[in-house]
């Protein structure tokens, strides 16, 4: 299944354009993101999160699913028609996954977006690791993940579409404290020796 990650930056220019043209923004949103448009191109939201509260460089992150590449291309043409890039400063990644998203059932989740960079140093460390060492490391990760009550929502391979990133995904935590505990465990495991990642916390947008 095809997924698109959209990461919206807090850009003073585009923020000003949005503030000065609310009617045009509304029309563009209806054209690009209405239920009718989504139904036409087979688009569905997976997550749509506010992130400014945790990192003021970024306003929002969202992941959509598409039925196929032609559907993504057709929807992208609508996005261009709406001149959407005048108002939103975006980083986008495409990825694929064989699994359906698994949204958490607990209330008020904290979502963590992660984007795994293609980093030669971490790739070299992974290459030196034996299968036994890798299995032991992931077992520790799994123990921490379960202990704090986290849930894996989605992971997508994206290297085929953008060689800067190997993949992206989303984890869900029941609280900020749970995320802090998991991050502490990762530091103690020296996890950053094996993966270089950009991460961002968000809460579901109402």
Predicted ranges, named:
Residues 1-58, 63-77, 84-166, 172-184, ...:
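Short S/T/G/P-rich N-terminal loop/turn motif that feeds into the first structured element of a domain
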Residues 196-197:
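C-terminal structured interaction module
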């Amino acid at each position: 299944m095809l997924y698109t990650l959209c990461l919206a930056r807090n850009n003073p220019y585009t923020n000003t354009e949005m503030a000065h043209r609310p009617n045009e923004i509304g029309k563009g949103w209806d054209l690009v993101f209405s239920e009718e448009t989504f139904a036409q191109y087979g688009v569905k939201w997976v997550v749509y999160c506010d992130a400014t509260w945790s990192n003021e460089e970024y306003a929002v992150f969202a992941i959509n699913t598409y039925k196929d590449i032609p559907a993504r291309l057709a929807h992208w043409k609508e996005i261009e028609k709406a001149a959407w890039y005048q108002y939103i400063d975006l980083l986008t990644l495409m990825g694929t996954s064989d699994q359906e998203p698994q949204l958490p059932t607990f209330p008020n989740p904290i979502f963590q977006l992660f984007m795994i960079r293609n980093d030669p140093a971490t790739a070299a460390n992974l290459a030196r690791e034996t299968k036994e060492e890798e299995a032991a490391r992931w077992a520790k990760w799994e123990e921490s993940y379960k202990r704090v009550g986290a849930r894996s929502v989605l992971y997508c391979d994206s290297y085929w579409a953008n060689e800067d990133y190997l993949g992206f995904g989303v984890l869900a935590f029941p609280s900020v404290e749970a995320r802090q505990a998991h991050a502490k465990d990762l530091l103690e495991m020296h996890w950053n020796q094996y993966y270089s990642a950009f991460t961002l916390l968000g809460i579901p947008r109402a």
